[in-house]
UniProtKB/Swiss-Prot annotation:
Subcellular location: Cytoplasm
Function: Component of the proteasome core, a large protease complex with broad specificity involved in protein degradation.
InterPro entries linked: Ntn_hydrolases_N (IPR029055), Pept_T1A_subB (IPR000243), Proteasome_sua/b (IPR001353), Proteasome_suB-type (IPR023333), PSB_actinobac (IPR022483)
Catalytic reaction annotation: Cleavage of peptide bonds with very broad specificity
Species of provenance: Thermomonospora curvata (strain ATCC 19995 / DSM 43183 / JCM 3096 / KCTC 9072 / NBRC 15933 / NCIMB 10081 / Henssen B9)
Protein name: Proteasome subunit beta 1
Pathway: Protein degradation; proteasomal Pup-dependent pathway
Gene name of the record: prcB1
Annotated catalytic residues: T57
Amino acid sequence: MASHDSYTGRLPGAFMNPGTSSFTEFLASYNPDLLPGRHMTALAGGMPGNVEAPHATTIVAVTFPGGVVMAGDRRATAGNMIAQRDVEKVFRADEFSAVAIAGTAGIGMEIVRLFQVEIEHYEKMEGRTLSLEGKANRLATMIRANLGMAMQGLVAVPLFAGYDTEREVGRIFSYDPAGGRYEEHEHHSIGSGSVFARGALKKLWRPDLSAQDAALVCVQALYDAADDDSATGGPDLIRKIYPVVATVTADGFRRLPEEEVGELARIVVDGRHDSPGGPTAPLR
């Protein structure tokens, strides 16, 4: 039988009670089944039978004097198959931050959407913006809540980056499946191709990068990852599928247009014709 509130059009009482500024905590107490991963059947062996959940793969982030650049390849895999060629893994978290996912794509994207609402809900409840470190801590709590699904093989791990308006620098935060939060310096990468991307980042990063050069470094690193990791997709000039690249500076979040990223991709691909291994670092 429907409640009296449904007849009058009023919000349920839970929405009218003063409480936490965390939307995730509110949802957990009011309707926990709506939290990421809760609707999936809890199975000791993970996914049933031979079902393969699509996985997002490689993400990179690079700091530069004016902020931070984050980029992700476009491939999602299911086992040894390419599940999608143009999936997006880098998202705007709020005006001064970006979040990207690697791992189980479905759960990761649910976490991103909930995180976006979490930040907006805090600002509406408290009347002020959450600090960059506060956002990073909120995301860690959300990842920790998914630990049960992670232990069954449905792991989703984000990379969070943004412009710290107090320190006036770009910052990068990584996470483990248990919700541990770690600040990374200069650059970082997560996902199946991260070991190859990190090698490229170490060789190409320098402290005086411009925003455009930092974006180019990200595309170079993703190309190296795709070169050695079959789950990472490189720039597809035929289909015009390029990495998603975003910058976060004092002016806010900006996703680079397809044309701009396409030009960076062509620079990388053209350079590989002469030097297949990519740019080399000086020995001295």
